[in-house]
Amino acid sequence: MEKAFKHRIYPNREQRILLAKTFGCTRFVYNHYLAKRRDAYEKDGITLNYTACAKDLVLLKKEYEWLKEVDSVALQSSVKNLDTAYINFFKKKAEYPRFKSKKTHRYSYTTKYTNGNIELFDNKVKLPKIGLVKIKKTRTPKGRLLGATVSQVPSGKYYVSLCYTDVEEVLFPLTYNETGIDLGIKDFIILSNGEKVENPKYLKKSIRSEERR
C-alpha cells in the first residue's frame, strides 16, 4: 500500500530560486510535449507515447541548456504525468489535457527516489538539486521511500509530500479510561464515574427560573 506524508518545508533564498526554476522547467516540458503530441496526431495521425517523448527529452535538454539546471527526474516525471493525463482521457476518466499556465498560484513537481537522492532527517530533508531543506515533520513513517512531490501554495508556503510503500501502521496505546454512559430522564447523561449532564429541557427551565428572580 502506498501512502504520502505531507510536511511543510522552509527553503532559503537560493533554494527558493531553484524551486522556481524547477516549477518553470517542468511546466515547460509538459506544455512542449502536449503541443508535440497534439500536432503529431492532428497532422500525421501519429500517437506519441511516453517512451518516444522520454527519448526526445534528451535532445530537448541539449537544445535548451537551462533545463539541465534542474532535477532531470522531475522533467521525466512531467512527461510521465502528461502520458497519464492522456491515458485517463482515452479511458474517459478525464478531459483532454490542458496547457499549464504561468499565471497559476499553485506550483508543484514530482521526483522519484533513486540512489539515496531523497532522504528525511530530524529537521531537514534532502531533495535532488535542491540540497538539504529545513522541514517541519508531521511524523516519521517506516516504509520504502518511492518519491517526493514538492509544492508551493497560493499563500507562498512550501510543502513536500513523501510517498512510501509497505508502510507499517503505528498503533497507539489507549491512554483514556473506559466510561459507561446511561441516558436518564431528569439528567440527560449519567456517566459511570458519577458525573451528570443535565437534560437540556430541565436546563432551560432552570435558566428561566433564575432569570425571573
Please place each PLM-identified region on the residue numbering:
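Nucleic-acid substrate recognition interfaces
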Residues: 1-213
